[in-house]
Amino acid sequence: MPEIRVTPLGAGQDVGRSCILVSIAGKNVMLDCGMHMGFNDDRRFPDFSYITQNGRLTDFLDCVIISHFHLDHCGALPYFSEMVGYDGPIYMTHPTQAICPILLEDYRKIAVDKKGEANFFTSQMIKDCMKKVVAVHLHQTVQVDDELEIKAYYAGHVLGAAMFQIKVGSESVVYTGDYNMTPDRHLGAAWIDKCRPNLLITESTYATTIRDSKRCRERDFLKKVHETVERGGKVLIPVFALGRAQELCILLETFWERMNLKVPIYFSTGLTEKANHYYKLFIPWTNQKIRKTFVQRNMFEFKHIKAFDRAFADNPGPMVVFATPGMLHAGQSLQIFRKWAGNEKNMVIMPGYCVQGTVGHKILSGQRKLEMEGRQVLEVKMQVEYMSFSAHADAKGIMQLVGQAEPESVLLVHGEAKKMEFLKQKIEQELRVSCYMPANGETVTLPTSPSIPVGISLGLLKREMAQGLLPEAKKPRLLHGTLIMKDSNFRLVSSEQALKELGLAEHQLRFTCRVHLHDTRKEQETALRVYSHLKSILKDHCVQHLPDGSVTVESILIQAAAPSEDPGTKVLLVSWTYQDEELGSFLTSLLKKGLPQAPS
């Protein structure tokens, strides 16, 4: 029996190093190839030895798909392709292709140049890896080979993020990557059609969360920032370079303008310019409001937000700083945090999810004494706030997407086990869909049924059986019945019943051909000549001369008309249905040869 096999190499009951191996109808696809931000050893990368035991990666894998540019989804890609060894195609969207190498290089600099880590990929490896990338457009069906095809859908989340449908014959899997079902200030909501895959693999980061009103969260965020700077404190907002950063910058920019505030706002050097460049380049990926106003005003060119210099961190007085990365695991955000953590007037606002092992996760879990590098202990006196501006779907959004796609089964990844368990039960009870949540290295096998049960109406069955007993008709019947699909159930009914159920009127499509004849007689006389001629030739057909002057041969209609510009010429209009195309073509050819001379 056909089956789909899924093995998470990363993100199984876990957030970080997303990497899911899918086998579908004899094809093997790797979905994402991320790194875990909470580890600095071999655990940061997925365990690729699971694949390589039986030979070369390229021989086993048909393709790799990257859903978006976040490092927990693409961070291990150069290691995988250049160090482990994979030469096959890597698919991603155009914005992901543009932004991915920049973030990989930024992270490489932190890991190798600053921390001196060994066994890490080089700048050249990033370039060589990106040469294997095939960029895809949204809703474009891409043939990976003769049997395997993939298609990208808009996922929201970050610029260029996509959900992917993987299809082989009648079997299909949809992988969501990270997505957001709520539009925000710069991106639209995720969308997928009713594609009814055998399996939907969905993220479950916020599996138990139902978010409050976005407007309340924004108001709360602005209030906390404003109160902190009013009392002379500094606000650190750790973000990733693209995504929540732009969302919160637009929010603060508007508030600063409205309140006429003079407190400086800074953003990590260089990244603002890069972000601006890519949002301009890929403006079709943003939401409708930004696309409409972009010609008059670029929402990403900020009047109040300036580039940050590391010397500014020691300046007296209030300020707001957006610094990367978003989980306080390295880089500029961690450096600033260490400087400001000891002052209770200051505040750090964590706007997104932090994986276990990162400083961000530790302070959100309540730790206030942190062991840093070199066994230094950092005491955190600054206020710590968590405000979810995360661009992940909440429980309501995940349920909405499952309902939209109508899969046969659901598999949860990219989430914590306890939260997954809650969502698994919710999906199974409310949507009556089987749901799985494998751990890393655990394989889920799903049998797929290539047959679809179809109900048939008794009336149609009786009619077809009676038709089968009759001698073969001259003309083949083009339509025996109509397949109706409703609520995932299929029924075969007669075409008359289908029209009645759907409230549709029957239409007939006819083809008309013009035949020119030289004839000075009146139209009625020409039609009579046509009737006599055809009656004498077509002994086995029903030829009739109707009261209105037209001629019929079976269902074929022939009418004579006189063009006003040439009274000596008559035009015969020969029309037929698709069913009688053969007879219609024959009559047209016959009439084009002309009519026999009538006795004078």
UniProtKB/Swiss-Prot annotation:
GO cellular component: cytoplasm; INTAC complex; integrator complex; nucleus
Short name of one Pfam family: IntS11_C
Enzyme class: hydrolase
InterPro entries the UniProt entry points to: Beta_Casp, INTS11-like_MBL-fold, IntS11_C, MBL, Metallo-B-lactamas, RibonucZ/Hydroxyglut_hydro, RMMBL
Short sequence motif named Nuclear localization signal, residue ranges: 469-479
Residues that, per the record, bind Zn(2+) 2: D72, H73, D178, H414
UniProt keyword Ubl conjugation present: yes
GO biological process, one term: RNA polymerase II transcription initiation surveillance
GO MF: RNA endonuclease activity
Homology family: Belongs to the metallo-beta-lactamase superfamily. RNA-metabolizing metallo-beta-lactamase-like family. INTS11 subfamily.
Subunit organization: Component of the Integrator complex, composed of core subunits INTS1, INTS2, INTS3, INTS4, INTS5, INTS6, INTS7, INTS8, INTS9/RC74, INTS10, INTS11/CPSF3L, INTS12, INTS13, INTS14 and INTS15. The core complex associates with protein phosphatase 2A subunits PPP2CA and PPP2R1A, to form the Integrator-PP2A (INTAC) complex. INTS11 is part of the RNA endonuclease subcomplex, composed of INTS4, INTS9, INTS11 and inositol hexakisphosphate (InsP6). Interacts with WDR73; interaction is required for the assembly of the RNA endonuclease subcomplex in the cytoplasm.
Protein name: Integrator complex subunit 11
